[in-house]
């Protein structure tokens, strides 16, 4: 079902046949691997379109997913702002995937992630036009200065956002901004003419 390979020193998990309608790329850490089968089953149940899935391992989560440096929110580990290098790696991965899996020019690439990877996916949408769709599941839109960054136009045809309905109830002064920020994010995208779905889910 899955193929595990390595590209430029990073572990990549591949799923799906060749010549698909969509290609979803998801940056994750190792803890998400055990949830992969259920994720793909859920995706398959939600659409009749063909898709393939590429999971990219991110060993330094706070460093490689953060768009710019920021102080720690939980614990002592801050954010070093290494997302630019990760973006370059993923952009270079796209032509490799097109060649390796016979993806046509009509195949649409989607970048999606959870938490800080959701923020990274949104940030990438502002920085590069390669991905037609962006998925941010509980994206870390509380990130310092994110509200100012999103005043510019995004390079995406569609954006999906979701948030757990209990996430704003945290006592952390930074994290409690998440609902206000994600609703602001959707409002800005809609004003830019970008179709955007925002869903609140249990949790």
Regions inferred by a protein language model and the residue ranges of each:
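A conserved amphipathic alpha-helix that caps or lines the catalytic cleft of carbohydrate-
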Residues: 40-43, 125, 186
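Short beta-strand immediately N-terminal to the catalytic nucleophile in serine-hydrolase-like folds
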Residues: 110-113, 137
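Cell-envelope and extracellular/periplasmic
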Residues: 19-22, 26-30, 98-101, 116, ...
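Short helix-loop-beta connector
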Residues: 104-107
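A conserved short beta-strand
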Residues: 130-142
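The feature captures the conserved acid-bearing segment of alpha/beta-hydrolase catalytic domains
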Residues: 140-203
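Serine-hydrolase catalytic machinery in alpha/beta-hydrolase-like enzymes
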Residues: 8-11, 15-102
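Gly/Ala-rich beta-loop-alpha elbow adjacent to hydrolase catalytic centers
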Residues: 112-117, 121
């Amino acid at each position: 079902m899955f193929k595990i390979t390595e590209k430029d020193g990073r572990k990549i998990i591949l799923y799906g046949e060749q010549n698909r309608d969509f290609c979803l790329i998801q940056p994750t850490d190792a803890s998400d691997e055990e949830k992969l089968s259920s994720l793909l089953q859920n995706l398959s149940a939600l659409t009749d379109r063909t898709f393939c899935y590429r999971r990219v391992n991110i060993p330094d989560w706070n460093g490689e997913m953060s768009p710019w440096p920021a102080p720690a929110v939980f614990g002592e580990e801050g954010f070093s702002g290494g997302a630019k290098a990760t973006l370059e790696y993923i952009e270079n991965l796209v032509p490799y995937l097109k060649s390796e899996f016979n993806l046509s020019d009509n195949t649409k690439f989607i970048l999606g992630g959870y938490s800080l990877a959701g923020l990274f996916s949104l940030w990438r949408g502002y920085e590069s036009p390669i991905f037609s769709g962006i998925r941010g599941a509980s994206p870390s839109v509380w990130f310092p200065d994110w509200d100012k960054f999103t005043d510019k136009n995004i390079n995406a045809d569609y954006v999906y956002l979701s948030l757990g309905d209990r996430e704003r109830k945290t006592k952390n002064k930074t994290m409690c901004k998440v609902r206000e920020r994600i609703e602001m994010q959707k409002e800005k995208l809609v004003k830019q003419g970008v179709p955007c779905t925002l869903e609140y889910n249990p949790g």
